[in-house]
Amino acid sequence: MMDAVAPASDAGPDLAAIAADASGERAVGRPTVYVYEAPVRICHWVNAFSIIVLMVTGYLIGTPLPTVAGEASDNFVMGYIRFAHFAAGQVLAVFFLTRILWAFVGNHHSRQIFYIPVHRKQFWKEVLHEIRWYAFLEREPKMYVGHNPLAQTAMFTGFTLFVAFMIVTGFALYSEGQGIDSWQHKLFGWVFAIWPNSQDVHTWHHLGMWALVVFVMVHIYAAVREDIMSRQSIISSMISGERQFRD
């Protein structure tokens, strides 16, 4: 299941690895591996754009712009912001669901962000190694075809769980305006059984936004850092689908 790669610079190509696809098999000695399929990459960038729109519009909804003079119909800025927030939320929900469905039919790497192999001691040993690497306590990085164990843990908790929470609470809040007969209320109205006070749901939804802001900043930093320091492609891999090992 683990897809660690530690290609030695003086090692020759491994023919078995060259014949392997990105299904989780080792790819020692292979400079380029096709990892992220097109649906994974499309969902990644659509979700990323949607989350950015949701963050900006969500912040403005929580901290509205100053009131301006004149007819409301002539100054509908907050209305447009609210509409953009709702639209981006529905786009995120559709592509997040698509991403989940693709995990059932895609390759091994398409499933990594949806689980953590908590029962595997080796996984946690490699998580600790990655923490030491990010803390500049390790001299050499380990290379992986897909996500490294720390990244897999971060993606599962910081993306999968957080985004699911935001979608559920977001649609629950949206159902208040749609009414109890709406599909949003029928699917997500149970949230108010947990937090009967609507303001509590607003508060948790707002806190979730800031948690995602932190995750996005760490995610971008880690991707850029690994692209430079670990000598393997990270950012371009989510464009081309291929992981390149430079050393």
Curated annotation (Swiss-Prot):
Regions that span the bilayer: 42-62, 86-106, 154-174, 204-224
Subcellular localization, as worded in the UniProt entry: Cell membrane
GO biological process: respiratory electron transport chain
Topology class, membrane: Multi-pass membrane protein
GO cellular component labels: plasma membrane
Superkingdom of this protein's organism: Bacteria
UniProt keywords, alphabetically: Cell membrane, Electron transport, Heme, Iron, Membrane, Metal-binding, Transmembrane, Transmembrane helix, Transport
Alphabetized GO MF terms: electron transfer activity; heme binding; iron ion binding
Function: B-type cytochrome involved in electron transfer from hydrogenase to oxygen.
Similarity field: Belongs to the HupC/HyaC/HydC family.
Protein name, as recorded: Probable Ni/Fe-hydrogenase B-type cytochrome subunit
Lineage of source species: Bacteria, Pseudomonadati, Pseudomonadota, Alphaproteobacteria, Hyphomicrobiales
